Amino acid sequence: MASLLIIVFLSHVVTYLINTIGATTVDNLLWLLYLKLPNNTSRTAVEQRRLKGEVVQLKREMKSTSSQDEFAKWAKLRRRHDKAMEEYEAKNKALGKHKGSFDLTVKSVRFFSTTGLKFFLQFWYSKTPMFELPRGWVPWQVEWVLSFPRAPLGTVSIQVWSGVCTTVVSLAGDALGVVIQSLILKMTKRGVARTSEGRPSQPMALKKEL
């Protein structure tokens, strides 16, 4: 069941990455990528941004135009502003509905591809051994624990393998995070040291002047 071993492990990796990055961040990134595709929603987003810029520009022109001295021009700008604002609000409302539907779809897919998938695999393959242990390698009490709840004795169940994957992925991810942070800190210190070496200190400059 090598393929099942890999599927369970990858599902835990994906879950860890989503939890580390943040589900909201992932949703926003997917939304931005979705808006890059040629579809009606992306065209609505482009039109919404255009109308927003037009509203801001007209508002600036209205502020720079006197409503008393240049009433005709100001009234014309006001009508254009109100019309653009109305269109912008309509596009913004439509885009908000699209984003709500998109977020719901993404959350559903994320649940069924991570948590839902793990629950299904653990239920469907509860009697399927992930791999067999060498005979007599561990006491039978340990074999019973490793095969819990329904796998044959002397094998490792999918529930136990899933727990091992959770622990290993979490520890590996935390260790990798510490390594990356230490590397970033070292690079930052080196950059500061090079900057300080390239600049003469103030006491030395004063000595040269004296």
Curated annotation (Swiss-Prot):
One annotated GO biological process: tail-anchored membrane protein insertion into ER membrane
Listed transmembrane segments: 5-24, 111-131, 156-172
Keywords: Coiled coil, Endoplasmic reticulum, Membrane, Transmembrane, Transmembrane helix, Transport
Region forming the signal peptide: none
Topology relative to the membrane: Multi-pass membrane protein
Cytoplasmic side: 25-110, 173-210
Coiled coil location: 43-97
Keyword Iron part of the UniProt annotation: no
Assembly with partners or alone: Interacts with GET3.
Entry protein name: Protein GET1
The species this protein was found in: Uncinocarpus reesii (strain UAMH 1704)
Encoding gene, per UniProt annotation: GET1
